[in-house]
C-alpha cells in the first residue's frame, strides 16, 4: 500500500509544508477539489504530476458557492476513500482546511468577476456561485502559491472564469483545463451522480448523446437554431427540466449564430429529479 500523503489542516502547518516542498526545488501544482473524489479528479492529479514536481490537492466543501436551497449539507463527504485514492495517486500534500480557517468570523472580502462570469449560463441559474468560487480559489492560490492549477472542463464556465481572474489579478498561476472523464455510456463523471436513482441514471446519458448529435449536425452544416431547438426538445422529452442548452464562443462564452463565429462550445444544464447535471462539448 502506498504511503499516505502529508495532510495539513491549519495555515501555519501549510506554510511549513510548503517550505519543505519548495526546498526540494521544482514546481508545484494545485488541484482544488471539494472531495468525493472520482476518476475525473484523479485524471487531474495524474496530469498535475506530469506538469509539476510536487502536487497539492485541496479538499474543501466551500459553503459560499452554495445557495441556501442547494446541497451543501448533503454534498458527499468521503474522506477515508478520498485519502486512499490520493495515496494511490502519489499525491504529495493534502490541504484540508475547515470553514473557520477559510472564512474567519470577521471575514469581509470577496472577489467578483464579469466577462465569462456573466454569460447567462451558470451565473443566471446560480447567481451566488461564481462569487464563492472566485473567492475560495483566489484564497487557495494565495495560500498554496502553485505554479500551475488544474481544473476539469466539465465545469467549463468555471474554468473560463478562473482563467480570467488569474489574468486580471496577475496571480501568476498557469491554469490548465483537463478534458472531461466519462462513464462508458458517456455520462460526465460527477460527485453528484451518486444522487441519481437507477431510473434517473439510465436517462442521464441523454445529455451527452444530445451534445454529440448536435455537434455532428452543426459540423454537417445544419442550421444552428434548429439544431439547438431539437436538442432542447430531446432533453425535455427524456424527463429533464432544462436550464439551458446553448451554443457559445469557446473562449468568451458570448452567443454565436453559426460555426463561422469562432470556436464553438455547446453547454447544457438540466435537472432530473432533484439532481442537477451539467455537460459540454466542443464542435
Swiss-Prot record:
It is found in: Cytoplasm. It holds the Pfam family Pantoate_ligase. InterPro entries: Cyt_trans-like, Pantoate_ligase, Pantoate_ligase_C, Rossmann-like_a/b/a_fold. Catalyzes the condensation of pantoate with beta-alanine in an ATP-dependent reaction via a pantoyl-adenylate intermediate. Its main location: cytoplasm. PANTHER family: CYTIDYLATE KINASE/PANTOATE-BETA-ALANINE LIGASE, PANTOATE--BETA-ALANINE LIGASE. This is Pantothenate synthetase. The reaction proceeds by a bi uni uni bi ping pong mechanism. SUPFAM superfamilies: Nucleotidylyl transferase. Belongs to the pantothenate synthetase family. Keywords: ATP-binding, Cytoplasm, Ligase, Nucleotide-binding, Pantothenate biosynthesis. The active site is at 41 (proton donor). GO terms for biological process: pantothenate biosynthetic process. Its EC number is 6.3.2.1. The gene is panC. It comes from the Bacteria.
Amino acid at each position: 500500500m502506498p504511503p499516505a500523503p502529508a495532510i495539513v489542516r491549519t495555515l501555519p502547518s501549510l506554510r511549513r509544508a510548503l517550505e519543505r516542498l519548495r526546498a526540494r526545488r521544482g514546481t508545484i501544482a494545485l488541484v482544488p477539489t471539494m472531495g468525493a473524489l472520482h476518476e475525473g479528479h484523479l485524471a487531474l492529479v495524474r496530469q498535475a504530476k506530469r506538469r509539476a514536481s510536487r502536487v497539492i490537492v485541496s479538499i474543501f466543501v466551500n459553503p459560499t458557492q452554495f445557495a441556501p436551497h442547494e446541497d451543501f449539507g448533503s454534498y458527499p463527504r468521503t474522506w477515508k476513500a478520498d485519502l486512499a485514492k490520493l495515496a494511490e495517486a502519489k499525491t504529495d500534500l493534502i490541504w484540508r482546511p475547515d470553514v473557520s480557517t477559510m472564512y474567519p468570523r470577521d471575514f469581509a472580502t470577496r472577489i467578483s468577476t464579469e466577462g465569462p462570469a456573466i454569460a447567462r449560463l451558470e451565473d443566471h441559474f446560480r447567481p451566488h456561485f461564481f462569487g464563492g468560487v472566485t473567492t475560495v480559489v483566489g484564497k487557495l492560490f494565495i495560500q498554496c502559491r502553485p505554479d500551475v492549477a488544474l481544473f476539469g472542463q466539465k465545469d467549463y464556465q468555471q474554468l473560463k472564469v478562473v482563467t480570467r481572474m488569474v489574468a486580471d489579478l496577475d496571480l501568476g498561476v498557469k491554469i490548465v483545463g483537463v478534458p472531461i472523464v466519462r462513464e462508458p455510456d458517456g455520462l460526465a463523471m460527477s460527485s453528484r451522480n451518486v444522487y441519481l436513482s437507477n431510473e434517473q441514471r439510465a436517462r442521464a446519458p441523454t445529455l451527452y448523446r444530445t451534445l454529440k448529435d448536435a455537434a455532428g449536425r452543426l459540423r454537417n452544416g445544419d442550421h444552428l437554431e434548429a439544431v439547438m431547438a431539437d436538442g432542447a426538445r430531446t432533453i425535455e422529452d427524456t424527463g429533464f427540466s432544462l436550464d439551458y442548452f446553448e451554443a457559445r464562443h469557446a473562449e468568451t462564452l458570448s452567443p454565436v449564430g453559426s460555426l463561422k463565429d469562432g470556436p464553438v462550445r455547446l453547454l447544457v444544464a438540466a435537472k432530473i429529479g432533484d439532481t442537477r447535471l451539467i455537460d459540454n462539448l466542443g464542435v
